[in-house]
């Protein structure tokens, strides 16, 4: 009888040891990848995991993931298409292009447009500035609905040749009045696309 009990006890102990051994083997943590060896895909997965675990506020989400603000059409004057454009760009990043007159150097453009940016800042407009040529600059807005107000300010400046908003060119105070204006505007539009790509890349690297 005692022998039978002893055998059962040994059997139970053996099964217990076997279970613990198998469990420890299955739950052994995998070797973690050194964060210094992470590539872009690893970082993207890590960011997704963080976003799943955290309740991210709407304002902290990337722009393409945010819900567009509702447009109240009752407040829009149908006779002014610009008003609809303003509402549709509310809360979205938008680029405003401007040209400085008088064939300036890039340094002169930097100084002149820096003064413009300072005036906009003092008027509580949040804009970033990127000089993209000897006489060309981009003003990047976090809220695109203010683009037309900024355009109105820029075209009133003495050294402003023209301003481009959403592909539409507005002549500035120092606009050129010649037959080549249309051709120059088409060239600017092509150059603006390249400049916008460079500015976006610079923004992402900041």
From Swiss-Prot:
Structured core: region residues: 93-166
Claim: Ribosomal protein is one of the keywords in the record: no
Key words of the record: Chaperone, Endoplasmic reticulum, Signal, Wnt signaling pathway
GO annotation (BP), single: positive regulation of skeletal muscle acetylcholine-gated channel clustering
A Pfam family the protein falls into: Mesd
PROSITE patterns: ER_TARGET
Cellular component per GO, a single term: endoplasmic reticulum
Signal peptide: 1-24
Location relative to the cell: Endoplasmic reticulum
Composition bias, Basic and acidic residues: 175-195
Renumbered ranges of motif Prevents secretion from ER: 203-206
Disordered: annotated span: 171-206
InterPro entries named among the record's database cross-references: MESD (IPR019330)
Gene3D superfamilies: 3.30.70.260, 6.10.250.640
UniProt-listed PANTHER family: LRP CHAPERONE MESD, MESODERM DEVELOPMENT CANDIDATE 2
Function: Chaperone specifically assisting the folding of beta-propeller/EGF modules within the family of low-density lipoprotein receptors (LDLRs). Acts as a modulator of the Wnt pathway, since some LDLRs are coreceptors for the canonical Wnt pathway.
Subunit (UniProt): Monomer.
Family stated for the protein in its record: Belongs to the MESD family.
Protein name, UniProt field: LRP chaperone MESD
Organism name: Danio rerio
